[in-house]
Amino acid sequence: MSIKPEEISSLIKQQIENFQSDVQVQDVGTVIRVGDGIALAHGLESVMAGELLEFSNGVMGMAQNLEENNVGIIILGPYSEIREGDEVKRTGRIMEVPVGEELLGRVVNPLGQPIDGRGPIETSKTRPIESPAPGVMDRKSVHEPLQTGIKSIDSMIPVGRGQRELIIGDRQTGKTSIAIDTIINQKDQDMICIYVAIGQKESTVAGVVETLRQHGALDYTIVVSASASEPAPLLFLAPYAGVSMGEEFMYNGKHVLVVYDDLTKQAAAYRELSLLLRRPPGREAYPGDVFYLHSRLLERAAKLSDAKGGGSITALPFIETQAGDVSAYIPTNVISITDGQIFLQSDLFYSGVRPAVNAGLSVSRVGGSAQIKAMKKVSGTLRLDLAAYRELEAFAQFGSDLDKATQAKLNRGQRTVEVLKQGLHEPLPVEKQVAIIYALINGFLDDIPVGDVRRFESELFTFLDHNKKELLDHIRTTGNLPDDSEFKAAITEFKQGFVTTK
């Protein structure tokens, strides 16, 4: 059998044409140092900043320091199995988290993986955790109220949708309680809530989840938890993961509330990572870009223009102070980024004024334009009255013979403080807040003993609910006060039947 040369050449041509290469080219590096949640790798010449990298045991990392001879990687998971000399390869992707309505009612870690034992989350949508904030022309000024259900906040330090309002105070002053009450109060308000727990005890997070479940608030809430036992990289990423989940809803025209509890622990985790990556330390050993750490996060909260769908993200970041020192580095940074702050004072908390809001140091820079007219009308002088009372209270301790005007101011002040007290997880609808503050400023409480004020309040609400529901409905639907004489007549009618304790 003779083999013809032209047949051989055509066979070879055919083989070459049909040849399929299964070789995949991958950029691979080698781990040269690992420890404390940080790895240093050689190679990876063309890696991107923030790119996801995969170690040989399947654990993911994120490229942070891009240096001439090596790459600093933060490890997003357990690092005890990673050894010097291990391979680390590029994925070509940047850090993303799953997003969508499937996450509602779930507890996830900062990578979007469920940690509540209720099975996988069926969503195919993802968003990068770092994304640019909406530009100037994409925004609209804050004009819709976000009712927290807390009298002292909704009356004196109002929050609007799209605002960033800092909640600042020492540990154990009721910061988390304010956030939980605000989330509970969003029921039936078409609002999606995201609670980001950073460096909290797992028992605390479990308690928060259970409280939300009991009040039916978990159905519209996503809990993102990076507990104290997690590595620093996850604590650093948790807030960005939370806001990315919120952006998916915002850009679809929905309203979102994101609570960051708390950013002090995120800053500490970022300081830890930066020092391990050998970045130069600055004031209080924080790296030079710690301001940018928080500003790029909080700038993503916005009220979008109508052309962009009119959605919003409202941010409630928490900062924990040491002995009430608001002039430390991180507190001053975040105060300068946000649109106001609610300052909680431990002295007030321990003296039984809860929520322990210090009205003098608290401010809302843009919330006033979002307040309903009825609340604006009744609460106009509340802050000044309270400040005057605090001043007189200190003065009155030194002398007993006070003139009638001073005594009247002290009496009104005591009742104001009493009215602004509120039980835990008892948020009030805005129409009831308006009713009790209206009664207060019009002198209906001046002759009620201080000890009876809380009872007067609850019985007034019951009376209005059963006998004068149209007054409350009018405030809720129109945002305006009802007819003055009608409102006063209703409160007078109730007061005549109110029995004070002897």
UniProtKB/Swiss-Prot annotation:
Bilayer topology annotation: Peripheral membrane protein
Entry function: Produces ATP from ADP in the presence of a proton gradient across the membrane. The alpha chain is a regulatory subunit.
Summary of subunit composition and partner proteins: F-type ATPases have 2 components, CF(1) - the catalytic core - and CF(0) - the membrane proton channel. CF(1) has five subunits: alpha(3), beta(3), gamma(1), delta(1), epsilon(1). CF(0) has three main subunits: a(1), b(2) and c(9-12). The alpha and beta chains form an alternating ring which encloses part of the gamma chain. CF(1) is attached to CF(0) by a central stalk formed by the gamma and epsilon chains, while a peripheral stalk is formed by the delta and b chains.
Subcellular location: Cell membrane
Region (Disordered): 114-139
Site (Required for activity): 362
Family in the record: Belongs to the ATPase alpha/beta chains family.
Reactions catalysed, as given in the entry: ATP + H2O + 4 H(+)(in) = ADP + phosphate + 5 H(+)(out)
SUPFAM superfamilies noted in UniProt: C-terminal domain of alpha and beta subunits of F1 ATP synthase, N-terminal domain of alpha and beta subunits of F1 ATP synthase, P-loop containing nucleoside triphosphate hydrolases
EC code(s) of this entry: 7.1.2.2
Any single Gene Ontology cellular-component annotation: proton-transporting ATP synthase complex
Keyword annotations from UniProtKB, A to Z: ATP synthesis, ATP-binding, Cell membrane, CF(1), Hydrogen ion transport, Ion transport, Membrane, Nucleotide-binding, Translocase, Transport
Name of the protein: ATP synthase subunit alpha
Enzyme kind, highest EC tier: translocase
